[in-house]
Amino acid sequence: MMLNAPLTGVPANDLADIALKLAETGLVIRDDFLPAELIEQLASEGRALRDNGGLRAAGIGRGQQFQANSAIRSDHIQWLDPETATPAQRHYLGLLEELRLAINRTLFLGLFEFEGHLALYPPGAYYRRHLDQFQGTQHRLVTVILYLNPEWREADGGQLRLYPDPADDGRFQDLLPIGGRLVCFLSGDFPHEVLPARRERLSITGWFRKRD
Ligand code: OGA
Ligand code: MN
């Protein structure tokens, strides 16, 4: 058997690189992380869910604290469930499992599981500035976002705006949600927001968590 054989199409070395970069800078961006056909498949499944009423208004907070609050975010989501995942979703989940192990080997974060959702931002939708850790809990340690939008341009809006210094609102980095782009960052270190999208915007967003 070949050592280091890629199980899911992304060489183990690339995953180790992502983990290293995450350890060094807290933020990693990888374009063309997955082949265009797989991205298109994931996107078309998202559009089918939209058409069949399979998406719900996203909320903020957990459990009792959950609120659908469209002043803060106006995207629509479906949580991923490994039991009912499509083959394309399962492929991506498999890759994330390898990434989780690679990050644990490098950062010793004790990442335990992944939770994530497909997200669709209709034209005009946004997500105001926030941290991916709910008040009083730090279970989400690493955020991983995969964008599903081919040919996204500046004029389409919908940028992910990251603030590397929580105390300095004037310093930020904008990223377009280009299909195949993977963005991975330490959840507690980067406040961020999604600027209003002028086109429908699709992504799979998730978090590696530690045990409750
Ligand atoms: C989120 C989020 C960013 C994006 O869902 O928590 O911040 O670019 N998403 O989709
Ligand atoms: Mn977020």
Model-predicted segments: where are they?
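Fe(II)/2-oxoglutarate oxygenase catalytic core
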Residues: M1-T143, Y147-L182, G188-D212
